[in-house]
């Protein structure tokens, strides 16, 4: 978490502190909720000025060399220094060095595989786990909880420490990294606990458009039109190709995507609504998303902001962390924004076979017991068309993009 260079980290108890709107580092306005406004670029500059070259280096730290005979002779001087600091005898200092040395931090049997559970264990939890693992191996099944845990771990660790093949793509020392959580769309009612469905890492030097292009939303993949008379007709466009307008909202400013001629200013309606009756929201500003990087922003950690696309598909965006890059991070700039977490969604199955993911949704369907009703491609064609492809009965058919597509 981001920390105050003069005090504790962001996780500890904080108290309201008078601050201007362009502070250099996060101060917590409301404990456990969000910080006061601070400038992302100033935060990075502040830490780069406080830390040394060794702290900012992205090179792998060299392993400590084993002590030689000459170095071992320095133990007496170290014992004397410890004895002086603690006010104890040299014998007690030497005993402390032996008892509290680094060698004592090693566990017994470190060479053993921790995944192998011994047969003669007396620990009940290990016996239960061994039984579950044996059952999975015999039945070739993995329960959903274990599958999701493995999936989440792979998502978070697949790029750790990865370096670029091209040295020009190497992240610069002292680069800022922000953790951005994108929540489910506001109109998505399945998960009312408002959990994020994507967590990505972005660099402070990246433009807002790079985050915008990396966000995967099922609304962008929708296919317009009714296809009951021509189910084999290939759609010309998806929604993302037709409606390219979008905006981010951060601290009183709407950052509109204006990269394409067909892009509209989606924030204009909101601004006009706010100013029409002096609703007390102050003066909103507009800017071009492609002209700003995250280092240019003033933000609050933990505060809900907004990403809007497709006209009315709105996502709450929460920036939860800001820090400097570490040598263990992914150092390939081309992989950012880097997806680290993604919520696992249940897929909607075909109403007929109950096996395959739905590809079609029908309305006013004389063959369906529900309205709307979902079908996989095979069952849809088998039920609604004859062997020559002619339409049977009356119904309206629309291509369906399941949210589980992103699993």
UniProtKB/Swiss-Prot annotation:
Keywords of this entry: DNA-binding, Nucleus, Transcription, Transcription regulation
Keyword Repressor: no
Chief location: nucleus
Pfam families: SNAPC3
Biased composition (Gly residues): 1-12
Quaternary assembly: Part of the SNAPc complex composed of 5 subunits: SNAPC1, SNAPC2, SNAPC3, SNAPC4 and SNAPC5. SNAPC3 interacts with SNAPC1.
Family statement drawn from the similarity comment of this UniProt entry: Belongs to the SNAPC3/SRD2 family.
Protein's name according to its UniProt entry: snRNA-activating protein complex subunit 3
Organism in which the protein naturally occurs: Rattus norvegicus
